[in-house]
């Protein structure tokens, strides 16, 4: 028996990477009976039945699991947002950060196209970088033109399983191509190298990039907060935690409650006002959703 990690699932076969070698495996029938489906990213115990074939015997406990794309044990999310073209969107970034935090995945913020910055926009982006770093997030400024930040990004990918996410047109494919040129990913679709037509079955594959594994399908294609409870939301704004203990009421939602230390910190500028505004917007959105039974 040996241990490995599923890097691709296709037509009933699971491709397991173990000690630098890939084994084409099938799952045991017991998985079907238990209604358990092995996922790309799963760490598994398998037995080899030949030079490059085998059977999966056991799926190890998952650290986390994404639905879209269907991948398990993601360690970090590379959140790519462009400085310009399209313009940087702090609210969309905050939405991604909440989703990533809720899945117990470490976010790494990558700001792309910084070579296109000039004048006032340069200082605007610099302030965002300071704000997010102050919260405790890792922020990498990159350019595929000047190659700035690429070495730092590679060091974060090394030895980890990552998904890449972010708004469209921000240069996700360009970044991965810069790190591994033989991928030749087309701009606008991280997954074109799989030769998908519009109606073919989507599958996800982990690509070896910079000493780590990167999902070839954009992560977090669903941006709703459906799986998050309202009272959990403050926890996914890390800078709120230090102030939350000082709120008068236990379980304070930091909206309109009296003597709310988080709201006071936002009013004093100790919490970035736009972060607090985005939080209020997300609270309102979650209050409007239909109840789940």
UniProtKB/Swiss-Prot annotation:
EC top class named in words: hydrolase
Subcellular location: Cytoplasm
Keywords: Cytoplasm, GTP-binding, Hydrolase, Metal-binding, Nucleotide-binding, Ribosome biogenesis, RNA-binding, rRNA-binding, Zinc
Listed EC numbers: 3.6.1.-
GO molecular function terms attached to this record: GTP binding; GTPase activity; metal ion binding; rRNA binding
Biological processes per GO annotation: ribosomal small subunit biogenesis
InterPro entries recorded: G_CP_dom, NA-bd_OB-fold, P-loop_NTPase, Ribosome_biogen_GTPase_RsgA, RsgA_GTPase_dom, RsgA_N
Main location (coarse class): cytoplasm
Subunit details: Monomer. Associates with 30S ribosomal subunit, binds 16S rRNA.
Name under which the protein is recorded: Small ribosomal subunit biogenesis GTPase RsgA
Lineage: Bacteria, Bacillati, Bacillota, Bacilli, Bacillales
């Amino acid at each position: 028996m040996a241990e490995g990690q599923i890097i691709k699932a296709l037509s009933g076969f699971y491709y397991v990477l173990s000690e630098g070698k890939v084994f084409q495996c099938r799952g045991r029938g017991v998985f079907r009976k238990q209604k358990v489906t092995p996922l790309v990213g799963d760490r598994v115990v398998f037995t080899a039945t030949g030079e490059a074939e085998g059977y999966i015997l056991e799926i190890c406990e998952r650290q986390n699991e994404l639905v879209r794309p269907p991948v398990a044990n993601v360690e970090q999310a590379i959140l790519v947002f462009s400085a310009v073209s399209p313009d940087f969107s702090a609210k969309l970034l905050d939405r991604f950060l909440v989703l990533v935090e809720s899945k117990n995945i470490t976010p790494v913020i990558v700001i792309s196209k910084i070579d296109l910055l000039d004048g006032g926009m340069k200082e605007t982006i610099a302030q965002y970088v300071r704000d997010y770093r102050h919260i405790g997030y890792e922020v990498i400024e990159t350019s595929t033109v000047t190659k700035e930040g690429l070495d730092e990004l590679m060091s974060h990918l090394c030895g980890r399983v990552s998904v890449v996410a972010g708004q469209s047109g921000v240069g996700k494919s360009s970044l991965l191509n810069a790190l591994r040129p033989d991928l030749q990913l087309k701009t606008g679709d991280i997954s074109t190298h799989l030769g998908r037509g519009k109606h073919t079955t989507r599958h996800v594959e982990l690509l070896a990039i910079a000493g780590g594994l990167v999902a070839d399908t954009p992560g977090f294609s669903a941006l709703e907060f459906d799986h998050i409870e309202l009272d959990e939301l403050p926890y996914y704004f890390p800078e709120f935690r230090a102030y939350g203990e000082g709120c008068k009421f236990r379980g304070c939602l930091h909206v309109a409650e009296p003597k709310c230390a988080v709201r006071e910190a936002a009013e004093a500028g100790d919490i970035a006002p736009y972060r607090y505004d985005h939080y209020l917007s997300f609270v309102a959105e979650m209050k409007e959703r239909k109840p789940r039974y």
